[in-house]
Amino acid sequence: MAPNIRKSHPLLKMINSSLIDLPAPSNISAWWNFGSLLAVCLTTQILTGLLLAMHYTADTSLAFSSVAYTCRNVQYGWLIRNLHANGASFFFICIFLHIGRGLYYGSYLYKETWNTGVILLLTLMATAFVGYVLPWGQMSFWGATVITNLFSAIPYIGQTLVEWAWGGFSVDNPTLTRFFALHFLLPFVIAGITIIHLTFLHESGSNNPLGISSDSDKIPFHPYYTLKDILGLTLMFIPLLTLALFSPNLLGDPENFTPANPLVTPPHIKPEWYFLFAYAILRSIPNKLGGVLALAASVLILLLIPFLHKSKQRTMTFRPLSQTLFWLLVANLLILTWIGSQPVEHPFIIIGQMASLSYFTILLILFPLIGTLENKMLNY
């Protein structure tokens, strides 16, 4: 029999074993589509970003006008920019749903896969943050100033660290230049970590909605899940294109249409929508260092999730109490997102503090407690 090049070629056999002949559980639902959607988001962002970088100038006196020039005079520049800006939003929607799926179905018990995923989330957040500074509008400048300033809360080395990050005594040209360098570099770092993420995943194989071993019933990834992924892809691209073509500035801040001015502070400094939940947690603590620690904890808490799993069952499929708690957490995150977009005044302050407290209570105390309770209920 003639050798199959797909299975014998050194490069093709790697692709084959991870995308074609990969044994996959027969019962994974649409919640398992988001991994491939994230890969597509990353590819789209790298391609549109590369095209934008060809027309961008990382200089404080030229950055704003170079972005405006791209939108006005470059062929389809407006489309490339709108896809890139809104593509970031869809990237975060997909990653939040992907993490939510992992939480619900106990995928975090694959510890290496989960931990590399958390590193990917942190890298993505860093990339989005430095990218938001590049158009050099008012919110770009003040967002950069406020968030980088948080490092000054670190005892002893804080102030030195901030000035080192800025490349001076305020956010200025050196800051913009290095942020552009980082924004160009980090997506490729994300791509590298993604390969590690997949390597760890393929060691164990995918989890499934029942949370039990699926070794007895596996199907090839291609054509079943390649086709399912293409369907998911189409369903994601339709709203992305709708947003980019009909309402491209819906999720942006109007302040960013004004060029950066260090002498005028915008009335409400707030990040893009996907950071609002963390921003609300940061603001809910009246102490600077405390706020920074809470901000870090809000994301890093994901690393503790595998150790807080007390249930005998892996997924929440047959655990109604944990399900209720899970959706309570989702609602809580939506409240935090809303609070992050509101001014710091009554009643938003107290709502934010309650929601922040609930967030940590649900994850650190209630999930393990309810898991243990459900184990007890199995005996009756």
UniProtKB/Swiss-Prot annotation:
<dbReference type="GO" id="GO:0005743">
    <property type="term" value="C:mitochondrial inner membrane"/>
</dbReference>
<keyword id="KW-0830">Ubiquinone</keyword>
<feature type="transmembrane region" description="Helical">
    <location>
        <begin position="227"/>
        <end position="247"/>
    </location>
</feature>
<feature type="binding site">
    <location>
        <position position="202"/>
    </location>
    <ligand>
        <name>a ubiquinone</name>
    </ligand>
</feature>
<keyword id="KW-0812">Transmembrane</keyword>
<dbReference type="GO" id="GO:0045275">
    <property type="term" value="C:respiratory chain complex III"/>
</dbReference>
<dbReference type="InterPro" id="IPR005797">
    <property type="entry name" value="Cyt_b/b6_N"/>
</dbReference>
<keyword id="KW-1133">Transmembrane helix</keyword>
<dbReference type="InterPro" id="IPR016174">
    <property type="entry name" value="Di-haem_cyt_TM"/>
</dbReference>
<dbReference type="InterPro" id="IPR048260">
    <property type="entry name" value="Cytochrome_b_C_euk/bac"/>
</dbReference>
<keyword id="KW-0813">Transport</keyword>
<protein>
    <recommendedName>
        <fullName>Cytochrome b</fullName>
    </recommendedName>
</protein>
<keyword id="KW-0408">Iron</keyword>
<comment type="similarity">
    <text>Belongs to the cytochrome b family.</text>
</comment>
<dbReference type="GO" id="GO:0006122">
    <property type="term" value="P:mitochondrial electron transport, ubiquinol to cytochrome c"/>
</dbReference>
<dbReference type="GO" id="GO:0008121">
    <property type="term" value="F:ubiquinol-cytochrome-c reductase activity"/>
</dbReference>
<keyword id="KW-0679">Respiratory chain</keyword>
<dbReference type="Pfam" id="PF00033">
    <property type="entry name" value="Cytochrome_B"/>
</dbReference>
<keyword id="KW-0479">Metal-binding</keyword>
<feature type="transmembrane region" description="Helical">
    <location>
        <begin position="78"/>
        <end position="99"/>
    </location>
</feature>
<dbReference type="GO" id="GO:0046872">
    <property type="term" value="F:metal ion binding"/>
</dbReference>
<keyword id="KW-0249">Electron transport</keyword>
<dbReference type="InterPro" id="IPR030689">
    <property type="entry name" value="Cytochrome_b"/>
</dbReference>
<feature type="binding site" description="axial binding residue">
    <location>
        <position position="84"/>
    </location>
    <ligand>
        <name>heme b b562</name>
    </ligand>
</feature>
<feature type="binding site" description="axial binding residue">
    <location>
        <position position="183"/>
    </location>
    <ligand>
        <name>heme b b562</name>
    </ligand>
</feature>
<comment type="function">
    <text>Component of the ubiquinol-cytochrome c reductase complex (complex III or cytochrome b-c1 complex) that is part of the mitochondrial respiratory chain. The b-c1 complex mediates electron transfer from ubiquinol to cytochrome c. Contributes to the generation of a proton gradient across the mitochondrial membrane that is then used for ATP synthesis.</text>
</comment>
<dbReference type="InterPro" id="IPR048259">
    <property type="entry name" value="Cytochrome_b_N_euk/bac"/>
</dbReference>
<feature type="transmembrane region" description="Helical">
    <location>
        <begin position="34"/>
        <end position="54"/>
    </location>
</feature>
<feature type="transmembrane region" description="Helical">
    <location>
        <begin position="114"/>
        <end position="134"/>
    </location>
</feature>
<feature type="binding site" description="axial binding residue">
    <location>
        <position position="98"/>
    </location>
    <ligand>
        <name>heme b b566</name>
    </ligand>
</feature>
<feature type="transmembrane region" description="Helical">
    <location>
        <begin position="289"/>
        <end position="309"/>
    </location>
</feature>
<dbReference type="Pfam" id="PF00032">
    <property type="entry name" value="Cytochrom_B_C"/>
</dbReference>
<feature type="transmembrane region" description="Helical">
    <location>
        <begin position="179"/>
        <end position="199"/>
    </location>
</feature>
<keyword id="KW-0472">Membrane</keyword>
<dbReference type="InterPro" id="IPR027387">
    <property type="entry name" value="Cytb/b6-like_sf"/>
</dbReference>
<keyword id="KW-0496">Mitochondrion</keyword>
<feature type="binding site" description="axial binding residue">
    <location>
        <position position="197"/>
    </location>
    <ligand>
        <name>heme b b566</name>
    </ligand>
</feature>
<dbReference type="InterPro" id="IPR005798">
    <property type="entry name" value="Cyt_b/b6_C"/>
</dbReference>
<keyword id="KW-0349">Heme</keyword>
<feature type="transmembrane region" description="Helical">
    <location>
        <begin position="348"/>
        <end position="368"/>
    </location>
</feature>
<dbReference type="InterPro" id="IPR036150">
    <property type="entry name" value="Cyt_b/b6_C_sf"/>
</dbReference>
<keyword id="KW-0999">Mitochondrion inner membrane</keyword>
